[in-house]
Amino acid sequence: MKNKIIAISNQKGGVGKTTTAINLSTALAAIGEKVLIIDLDPQGNASTGLGIDYQNRNNSIYEVLASQSNLFDAIQNTEIENLKIIPSTVDLSGIEPELAEVNDRAFTLKKILTDQNSLNDFSFCLLYTSDAADEHSW
């Protein structure tokens, strides 16, 4: 089966986005699917909700997007079998200046996911986005 990418996004806060992301990823993992959730929200609620301590987020999605780390090094285990996460930190809110000179910067994440064949080990990739309505809501 080819992997599926699911974006969980809404520009309004408080609509159940975190609950949906955590429950969907956990349910898929529970039936044996290999799941990667990428936390693209600087608040890091999906990361926290899946038990990733803030002190253990040295390689986050910020470092990946800013080309300071590769995607594979940022993937962390959760306490749930078959479920891994790339956590987020508040640093992600400052990613725009880092990408200002990048051509086609709106496609940065897509390039990373396709160029590195990073999703080959996963059946599903869930993109948990922020509430912000900006170019990098992914």
Region spans (language model):
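P-loop NTP-binding core
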Residues: 1-130, 137
